[in-house]
UniProtKB/Swiss-Prot annotation:
UniProt enzyme class: lyase
Species whose genome carries this gene: Dickeya chrysanthemi (Pectobacterium chrysanthemi)
Catalytic activity annotation: Eliminative cleavage of (1->4)-alpha-D-galacturonan to give oligosaccharides with 4-deoxy-alpha-D-galact-4-enuronosyl groups at their non-reducing ends
Gene name of the record: pelE
Name the UniProt record assigns to this protein: Pectate lyase E
Pathway annotation from the record: Glycan metabolism; pectin degradation; 2-dehydro-3-deoxy-D-gluconate from pectin: step 2/5
Cofactor: Ca(2+)
Function summary: Involved in maceration and soft-rotting of plant tissue. Pectate lyases have been implicated as pathogenicity factors which induce maceration or rotting of plant tissue. PelE is sufficient to induce these effects under laboratory conditions.
Signal peptide: 1-41
BP terms from Gene Ontology: pectin catabolic process
InterPro entries: Pec_lyase, Pectin_lyas_fold, Pectin_lyase_fold/virulence, PEL
Binding site for Ca(2+): D182, D225
Amino acid sequence: MNNSRMSSVSTQKTTGRSALGTKSALAAIIATTMMVSVASAASLQTTKATEAASTGWATQSGGTTGGAKASSSKIYAVKSISEFKAALNGTDSSPKIIQVTGAIDISGGKAYTSFDDQKARSQISIPSNTTIIGIGNKGKFTNGSLVVKGVSNVILRNLYIETPVDVAPHYEEGDGWNAEWDAVVIDSTDHVWVDHVTISDGSFTDDKYTTKNGEKYVQHDGSLDIKRGSDYVTVSNSRFELHDKTILIGHSDNNGSQDAGKLRVTFHNNLFDRVGERTPRVRFGSVHAYNNVYVGDVNHKAYRYQYSFGIGTSGSLLSESNAFTIDNMKKISGRDKECSVVKAFNGKIFSDKGSIINGASYNLNGCGFGFSAYSAKIPYKYSAQTITTSLAGSISSNAGYGKL
């Protein structure tokens, strides 16, 4: 993927040129300089921007601080894609805090015209030691992806991110139309904290899909991908809503050489509202999910609930005190309908402690999937509160952007 960075204005040859050309070049230089200064001239608008991850896997092996050590010259306030790119400054890994004070259209208001065009302009690379935080309820991103790839120590907080719409999905025989582009990608990266972030299909929901060649023209991929040996990730107090294939941890059954022993991820105090599946689906990784709320409907017209926890090849998951409210649940393969919140994809390790399904306790360990109990030690301090319908309501109310 391409790194987006501010490019300086090249020196123009003056031979045979009019004074108008020289003035145009000067104007471009001034405009570029002003753009950088707008991105650079900012005071810290919230002390939340200097906070580090306080629990979960992101606290381990040195912790996750993002841009907490940023100097005053590396604190920015941005409200446009040009300002955002200027603040990121390409691959500059010096600590920085980027405060998002407006709705940022990553496309810059120019519609994508092809796969190549969307790939070139919609994928925004985030460098190491960066905190990106929305101010109030103003921090929004549309028409693109935040790509955290090959870096370390990144924090995303208090943001609304609309899942991108693929303008040129590809067709796979036997599998139909498939889309690219996730809202957030964590790839080959360690130490990431995602907190109070809302990711949603927003204005373009799946019931608006058309058909092409007789099949549904799918234009959404995932909300969040964590893959290729990424490690030490915490996702907290966030809201995932109105989406189908939501969170993937480990992208392939054949990537064990890179993923084994990594992909350690914590999910706590999140709301998954009207999402179809993969919250998460895990391969190779070790996932700890506690005090999360899952709301869905098997008969939903756009986002039919299928399952929450997908246990894939060499993946393991510990569930503690989660709340599932799923309408129109049905028995699958002769098992109790409550067992449908878990799906086995060749995975062998899963345990649940104290979760409730539709307001009542249920033993998910007795569903007959043949899982071994999760026995790995959780190395960080945490507090999984006893889940009740009242607590589930509080978690839901606090989840997502604008609540920090």
